[in-house]
Structure formats: structure tokens, C-alpha cells
Amino acid sequence: MRYARIMGVTGVAILWTAFAAGAADLPGCTAPAGFQDYPHPAIAPMDQLVSHTEEVVIGRPLVAVAEAMDKPLKETIRQSQALPGVSGDFMLTKGDFGPAGSRHIVCLTDGGSVEEESLDRGQSGNAAWFRYIVWNYRTPKARPIAYGVGEFRTVQIDSTHTRVIWTYSFRLKDDVFPGELGALGQWLFRVGFLDREYAAMMRGVLEGYKTAAETPSRP
């Protein structure tokens, strides 16, 4: 779940605003019963995580891409036959979600939820990044997952094209199938879920941005 931004003072401001707009509290989403807010798990070295990357080149300048991204999460990550979508979120820290250290509960359409924290965001020249961690999964699809680390990197490659790169890395639970099988379990998780159902969700989100940015607005 999440988005990156870039380019000049105006472009960066719009992009960070777009990100925050998707994270405002929405009706009906609250912390789950018995929820206790603990610090996020320590992040393991990359060779202990299972990762997948998707990217898209959008034929529009950064500002137009930022405007296309300016919508709530529930309109970005929709329910599919394989995975739940987002139904809303609930802030755990003051202010909007986005600055490093901000946290919220993300509610899912299957009645479950996850906790998400911003780890880092920034911009330099024509590039920007946003990194975050997701844990406290309360959804059947995520039973084998201890936590996930996502990262968006956005680069304006010329005056009319912007590349968005999204990487998701998961740490599996050591005592639950398939993580209990070690390297074999990571492979099974990759080929059976990450490179299929989850990759399809990631592509759908990125293609949604591309379509929205490249479709002329009606007067």
C-alpha cells in the first residue's frame, strides 16, 4: 500500500499532498478490538526477505502524475477475486500519514486490517522516494507474513515522462507454512503468491495511475 513523489518545489508539494490525501481518516475504520500499538518489527537484511518489483512509465510530467495519484486509498487498492481492497484508515499519530514516524491502521474489505508506518520520504533533484513498513496483519491472506516493507521511487525521466518503481519485500513467519521451510518456503511464497496475486495488485495500482494521468480531463 503507498506512493512516491518528485520534482521541484511545486511538484514535490503536490505529490506529498496527494499521498496525505489518501490517508485521511475515513468513516467506519477504527483500531481492532484489543489492539495495542507497539513499535514496528526490526527489519531483517534484504537476503532474508522475499521481494517483487513493478514499474510503469507514464507519458505525462510529474505534476500530472501527482494529480492522478491524489485520491483515497480505497479508490486505489480495490478488492479483487484474490485479495481484499482498502475500505478506509484510522490515524494512530497526530497529523496526516506521510512524514517519517506517522502510523495508521488500514482497514480492509474482508473485515481485516494492517498497521502501517512511514519509514522515510524525501526528494533530491528529479527523484523522490517513500519507504514504509506494514505489520500487524489481521487478514487470512497474510497469515504467513510477519511484515512487509514497501518502497516507491519516482523519477521524471524527461519533460513528458515519469517512471514509478514500486518494490515490496516480505518477511515470512518462521513457525508458519511456508516460512518454516526456509529457502524452499520463500520460493513457494514467491511463485504461489507474490509473483502472481500480489504482483497483479501492484500492476493494477500502477496502471490505474497511468490511465488517470494520461486520460484527458473533461471540461
Positions of the model-derived regions?
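Intrinsic-disorder/low-complexity, polar/charged segments enriched in Ser/Thr/Lys/Arg/Asp/Glu/Gln
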Residues: 49-57, 103, 113, 129, ...
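Glycine-rich portal/gate segments that line the openings of hydrophobic small-molecule binding cavities
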Residues: 74-77, 87-149, 204-219
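A short, structured loop/turn motif at beta-sheet edges
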Residues: 59-63, 119-128, 153-163, 214-216
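Bacterial N-terminal signal peptides that target proteins for export
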Residues: 1-9
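Hydrophobic ligand-binding cavity/cleft-lining segments
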Residues: 23-96
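Beta-strand/loop substructures that line and gate deep hydrophobic ligand-binding cavities in soluble
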Residues: 137-196
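Extracytoplasmic/secreted proteins, especially bacterial periplasmic and envelope-associated proteins
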Residues: 60, 64, 113, 197-204, ...
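Bacterial N-terminal signal peptides
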Residues: 8-18
